Amino acid sequence: MKTQKKEVYNFQSETKKLLHLMIHSLYSNKEIFLRELISNSSDAIDKLRFESISSPELYENDSDVKIQISINKAQRTLIISDNGIGMTKEDTIENLGTIAKSGTKSFLQSLEQKQNKKNELIGEFGVGFYSSFIVSEKVSVRTRFAGLESNKGILWESSGEGEYNITNIVKKTRGTEITLFLKKEEEEFLETWRIKNIISKYSDHITIPIHIQDYDKKNKTYFWEQINKAKALWTLNKSSITEEEYKDFYKHLTNDQNDPLIWSHNHVEGNQEYISLLYIPEKAAWDIWNRDNKHGLKLYVKRVYIMDNSQAFLPNYLRFIKGLIDSSDLPLNISREILQDNSITEKLRKSLIKKSLSMLEKLAQKNNEKYQIFWNQFGLVLKEGPAEDHENLNKIANLLRFTSMKSNNSEQKMSLKEYISNMNEQQEKIYYITADSYSSANNSPHLELFKKNNIDVLLLSDRIDEWMMNYLSEFEGKKFQSISKEDISLNKLTKEKKIKNKDVSTEMIEFLKKVKNILGNQVKDVRLTHRLTETPCVLLSDSTEMTTQMAKLFSAAGQSVPELKYIFEINPDHILIKKICTINNENELHQWIKLLLDQALLAEKGNLENPHKFISRMNKLLIK
């Protein structure tokens, strides 16, 4: 027989780095490699089932799908095989020679930075095949894609040290067979009982039968024993599933090694029939902030696997939810493209959004401590909701958490209902302020009048907050009001009244005119204010113009930002204003007015265009 020529390939540079991390430092819990390989085999069989719907010949007269594991102690090998879809030569290069996933560099950086969380991160990333090198000195893969001739088989071999070999072989059966040549110190994985325990622990709910070859000492024969239950857990009655089984299934589904925070299992009948099993993780994935990364639910139709990461059923702001949906109404041959425009999909989507939000509502009502864990991990993602989902706006708003002026700390624990329940009797609006940080918001001069009159204010300091507030106009009949806008009125709540010229001294009126003249078009207007108690002046945004925080958002996104012109308000009762009002030297008065404007700009924006000029001006005035 003619010897087939080996082709030598180099691993992609990032794959080399990942292999090095795995082999030398990654899993403290090494047994997970078997879970990863079984999961890959299960996926391969799921893909075969899906493809065979339109091409039944792919079964090659063998529809009895299974995963088999055998041990050879003499050769120190562990073999995991399946009769799934298999791989072509191109598939082996793409799937085994490179990490074909966006965000790889970020992932590797995260691994290096979080040495104590490597297991957790590698599970999130899901690079299952490479985990075989944790316990193996060499890995051999024999595979043939379903439907191809037997002489189109591929042998892939590597010791995980920089290169791999590919050879054409004859393989009579479709599917993939992985042979692990175990390291001497990993011989525990040659014990049948050990492999059975790992399968029961991690893969009991794989829907494909998993068999292990065992030896009958009495009859001196080998036999195949099925280890897992091979039942679709989500199809079972909720009352028959234990909490531990739900948790184990979540870990199998997501590769997350932590328990889920909560889950919701629903069997829906009627106009639409489906089963959903939705989980909320305990911790956010390392790439949760990347809206473009793959996310979504695993889709089944009548128990047949269709696709992973189907984004058609949940919006982006719920991308932290993991799980699956099994529909009885969708066609088996549905594609990703058709799924997006399908009327059944839209109905399922609406239903699943309501189930998801209801799950969070129940958690917030029944277990505030757990809900706070959720909020700390995923609150920023949920804040995208008001902009994306107007239909469920009130439900989302009810789930939001804030800190406030009266909270005296930065922890976001207050709901809008709680804020309203503590409002003053005649208060008609929900007051808030946005800033770059909690400290900036909590120390803003805009709060002075509210502190004086014991009116609470929500302090919003997350980057997304200003954007979110554009879509939150009211909650339970109470309108939201930014306290940094000019159109604020507290007349009903306080004894303060808008300052009128007749109530102000002639000197102060003249001073106001001078300030307007000096600042000219640097500001939109100059006014006396009733808002301030401790600060000499403050800047306000016009009610119709872009706010400071929104301008910062636009700028950070590379968008052009219109020039902001503020309303400059002066506190006539402040001692500094009274002193400046008496200055007769025109140049000195100019310097003081510009210094006041710079101070107000610094308080409002957190920075100045020319800080050196500000410092120089301040030093000169201090010397005087």
Curated annotation (Swiss-Prot):
UniProt keyword Ribosomal protein present: no
Signal peptide as annotated in the record: none
Pfam families reported in the protein's UniProt record: HATPase_c_3, HSP90
Record protein name field: Chaperone protein HtpG
Homology family: Belongs to the heat shock protein 90 family.
Region named C: 553-624
InterPro entries in UniProt: HATPase_C_sf (IPR036890), Heat_shock_protein_90_CS (IPR019805), HSP90_C (IPR037196), Hsp90_fam (IPR001404), Hsp90_N (IPR020575), Ribosomal_Su5_D2-typ_SF (IPR020568)
Functional note: Molecular chaperone. Has ATPase activity.
UniProt xrefs under Gene3D superfamilies: 3.30.230.80, 3.40.50.11260, Heat shock protein 90, C-terminal domain, Histidine kinase-like ATPase, C-terminal domain
Chain spans, region A: 1-336
